[in-house]
Amino acid sequence: MIPFVDAHIHLWDLNHIRYDWLSPPFSDDGPNGSVEPIARNYGVADYREDLARWNVIGAVHVDAGAAAESALRETQWLDTLAAVDGLPTGFVAFAALNDPDVDALLAAQAAHPRVKGIRHIVNWHADPQRTYGPVDLTVDPQWQAGYGLLAKHGLSFDLQCYPGQMPGLVPLIERHPDIPVIINHMGMPVLTDPDGLNDWRRGMKALAALPHVAVKLSGMGFIRRDWTMAGIAPLVHVAIGRCGGDR
């Protein structure tokens, strides 16, 4: 079986760190729908059991949505897991890039050798059922300045946004070729938008033209909660076609 590194996993101990999005009350509203089925502790042993049929030789933990003040605590907890269990092998931690103290936050995260990058979810959409926040942070000069500090600390950026935000992000990402960017969840096309599929195609084309941008084939359920292999395959083919097998 082909060995591979799982590029996007989440672990959590709800008794150790609070995750508001994993706490009741639960609702079908919002971009994630009801998360009640996964609102339980999920550790390395659970992950190994779920992945037993695959030859996983490493796994990258991506920030799991803890409160901002718990971001460093999450990294410290993951370090403990990695030291004992051998997983995760790398971390993409959280830092709010619009925080006035972001330079210190990035330095604190980068002090942990397993931290390779940062994710700050920036999905914004005019539809309140889709948006992750009240404003589009990607157009905020303070957020853009925080983004520019990632290279100073040797960190990549996991980009989770919607296709409508992609064209506006291109100039910023282009100005910083020393910050590797990894598009999360295939760029999260919003198929219910009037021109959602074409918005995604255009956005992915614009970002993929930058050689320091890669994409994860993940998060199919964000695109369609009732996704199937047959239904998602055309989108996977487009993503691979845009970025190539090496990205």
Feature-to-residue mapping (PLM):
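Helix-coil boundary/capping segments in enzymes
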Residues: 1-247
